[in-house]
Amino acid sequence: MSSQHFQGRFEVEFKYRLSDVDAFTCALAALNPEVMLEDNQEQDSYFDTPEHSLAAEGKSLVIRTMQPSGIQLWIVKGPEADRCEAVNITDADKAASMLRTLGYRQVLAISKRRSIYFVGPFHVTRDHLEGIGDFAELAIMTDDEALLPDYRQQLQDLATRLGLSSAQLETRSYRTLCEQSLTLNSEKVPS
């Protein structure tokens, strides 16, 4: 794993909804990316207080497990849109237990199939969320906040090279998309 791709306190990220996964995959292959992993199953467990105080502050606390790669992460996002920190952990179950001991509870679980590639300094993910859709995320992490505007432009240029348009841009987080889907599905269930 190229760990330098995932270091930093800030993350510039653009998410695109894919209408043609094969066309995107072909465009990505033409850039000769380095493959980190393909078709891993990720399970993201979101934790918050019973009062949802983290969500109210624009923060997310996530324990992520990835199989078959075996990667386990503790992730904190927010409150700023570009703020994201992650650290490798060795026991996701123990970390979740510790959070519950501290009064947090799991408020959402998201499963996705993810492939991660590197194109120069950028990481490109191809994600599938059952019932939600297919997405590409283009991102870079840094500790230097002054670089964020330049990285935004470079990622938009990369998106163009990958055949992605601003019409495909998805500004909602996977958490929001899943919560909205759950709300819609619960409204469809007859009482």
UniProtKB/Swiss-Prot annotation:
Its main location: cytoplasm. This is Adenylate cyclase CyaB. SUPFAM superfamilies: CYTH-like phosphatases. Disruption phenotype: Cells lacking this gene show no impair of cAMP biosynthesis. GO terms for biological process: cAMP biosynthetic process. The lineage of its organism: Bacteria, Pseudomonadati, Pseudomonadota, Gammaproteobacteria, Aeromonadales. In vitro, CyaB catalyzes the biosynthesis of cyclic AMP (cAMP) from ATP. It seems that under the physiological conditions CyaB has no function in cAMP processes. In vitro, it is also able to hydrolyze substrates such as thiamine triphosphate (ThTP) and inorganic triphosphate (PPPi) at a low rate. It has a slight preference for ThTP over ATP and PPPi in the presence of manganese ions. This PPPase activity is probably not of physiological importance. Belongs to the adenylyl cyclase CyaB family. It is found in: Cytoplasm. It catalyses: ATP = 3',5'-cyclic AMP + diphosphate. Residues 9-180 form the CYTH domain. GO terms for molecular function: adenylate cyclase activity; ATP binding. Keywords: ATP-binding, cAMP biosynthesis, Cytoplasm, Lyase, Nucleotide-binding. The keyword Nucleotide-binding applies. Optimum pH is 9.5. The active site is at 46 (proton acceptor). InterPro entries: Adenylyl_cyclase_CyaB, CYTH-like_dom_sf, CYTH_domain. GO terms for cellular component: cytoplasm. The keyword Nuclease does not apply. The gene is cyaB. Pfam families: CYTH. PROSITE patterns: CYTH (PS51707). It is an enzyme of class 4 (lyase). Optimum temperature is 65 degrees Celsius. Its EC number is 4.6.1.1. Inhibited by GTP.
